[in-house]
Amino acid sequence: MSDRFCTLILGGSTAYNSIGFFNSELARVIRTAGLDVVFLNINDIHEFNNILRQTMADYPERIAMCISFSGFGTEIGDTSDNGNLWQRLKIPMLSIMLDHPAYYISRHNSPTPAVMRIYANRDFLEFNRDYLRPKYRTAYLPFGAMTYGRQPHKREPKKTETPLIIFPKTGSNPDTLREPWKILPRLMQRILNESIEHYWGETTRSGAVSNSVLAAADAAGLELRNDLTLFTFFIAAIDDYIRKFKVDVIARKLLPLPVKIYGDGLNYLDTTNARAQILPPVEYDKLIEIFDESLAIISMNQNIDDECHDRPYSALGTGCMPITDINPWWEKNYPTLMPYSYDFRNRDITMAIQKVSDDPETTANIAWSESQRQCQKRTFDMMVIDLLELALTHRYFTFNFQPPQLYFRKCGD
């Protein structure tokens, strides 16, 4: 029997094993902090139960926490007579939420105090707070440079070689997303279409779509702020469409350029005479190896204003140049990278690609300087250590806290 504490990490099947790879990164950092790690597979309930029982026997009262991504496993037991599994076992469950709460909304609002949600950007956290109004804990933890346990390295581009610029992104024809809208009631079609018009009228960059949905609904006389079902339906539909539309714009701009695009769903594009290569998606561990060989990685943010996608953090973590779309947060925090950034109206992505191609050496120098700065400021490893601190606080106040004064006891009733 071990006298060490253990952390459970919950995983399952995801596209290209992205969550599986992130879970291995969590485990790497947690082990350096002195905790053992046990993996649970939510897709195999028999294996899940056996490993959990064995772990509880091996670590009696020393399972420090369970961690998952995207709400995996947070709802286990919610609808059973015994109640939520983590509450029953007194194991704090922390889930790192990567998507807008409008997607899989139940994963963002658990009925049990054992579950705590961690958001990597404030936009999603604030939507959760303002509209889902969760009864239990949430927190904000930004990622930081993702080194994947490797040392970042400065690129040394050769003048005789075309620099490797990649765009790892799956897409789909945005027009096909609008087809099902045609059978909806005319009022819903109006709100969907006017939300899109409002979004492009208000922003040329990222930005949440919820304000555009509200503006379109208000103009139609429909109040959505107290109608979470309709509100999140519109947000999910518009958010998905806008993101796919942006991928389409980027991919079309890249076709004449010497870029490698890794992803599914772009076979509808006419690649006749294209210089860009559209390649099949690869598993995440292979993608990390490609990151190490690249001079620049093209990214596209989610529709957010106050953080970036994890892809620029991967670029900075390996020492190469992130080429991403601009939002106010990016503009404020990465002014030296603005010449290599783009939006969807005035700053064409082809200009950023051309800048990399015209002067790879300067690109490499700027990327390396920014990589060093980011790795000193914040990394994914630092985020995981902060996560462990949050878990200890969450565990204490959920399962161990005894109010020292009568006033606090009354507040807790």
Q: What is each PLM-predicted segment?
A:
Residues A57-E75:
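Short N-terminal targeting/anchoring amphipathic segment
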Residues M1-A15:
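Nucleotide-activated donor-dependent transferases that construct or modify glycoconjugates
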Residues W86-D99, M116-A120, F143:
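Active-site proximal beta-strand in glycosyltransferases
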Residues Q87, I105-A120, D130-R133:
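A conserved, positively charged/aromatic
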